[in-house]
Amino acid sequence: MRAFNYSTIKEQKWDSDVLGLIAAIYKEAGKQELYLKQRPEELKKLVEIAKIQSTETSNAIEGIVTTSTRIRQLVEEKTTPRNRDEQEIAGYRDVLSIIHESFDAIPITQNYILQLHKILYSHMNNPLAGRTKATQNYITATYPDGHVETLFTPLAPYETPEALDRICEEYNRVIGNMELEPLIAIPVFVHDFLCIHPFNDGNGRMSRLLTTLLLYRNGFYVGKYISLEAKIAKNKDLYYDALAQAQTGWHDGAEDVVPFIKYLLGTILAAYKDFEDRVALVETKLPALEMVRRASKNRIGRFNKQDIRELCPTLSDSSIEGALRKLVATGELKKEGKGKNTCYFRLN
């Protein structure tokens, strides 16, 4: 079976990109901590939006979808699931809520990971919920002509429980001994988890939930206010490319995990930057028109009402719609499309 020893990672020489990302994340985390102490009430809307986005996008990456209205109702627990997709979405909502509320009481062990997986499927009858895989799984690609290619073969079912135990032990050891920088240990753990692919279903969603859990446990709370899952979904191809590069040679312990580390750290930093942008708009106490004007200047290319809502969480939908109408009327924005397909772009 593949051996795991996270102590060897500390001997690696990191390039300026990795070191720069780590330094920038710590700087942004410090700024966020200061803001949370000063203005916690103003950020409640950001939490609500991030929960909805995280639940919607993490499931959508795996082809699990419903309407935006239903997503919002499910996340706010104002309705019950109507079908299998909505059952899976409700399960993700439940796990995410547990992580938000109790991350410091969830140790990184196989037992707790299995419990979280069981909750992920708690709204449906899945006999494999909370159990490691019973049959071999494969990471595949389906091409336009219909042929399927195996890109990576994860560990065999009989190897999986021990491997999951080992990566938890290694992670806890290097973090507990302060032997390895958490922002290196977290992507290494998540990458190993994805290569083990411990479940017959739900590995991608569990990896994203574990990323949030690990970040919270190490004092990086950006995922509570800005959806990391939405960031990953927006750059899904880059995510899969980084994962594929880092998987080469994994079974022999000869993988280069740096592409995945850079990808995940870049995603975390981008979320912190978004947090700073949104806080700047919330903080200024501007009239709705000026808030929407400034938010539109933060967007490159086309954007829709939802994009503005994310940047201006304190504004109601009617205030956003009214401001957009005025900006179109004054010639600052151009409007395209109708209904759900409506989008805008700046003219100057």
Model-found features: residue ranges?
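FIC/Doc superfamily catalytic core
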Residues: 1-348
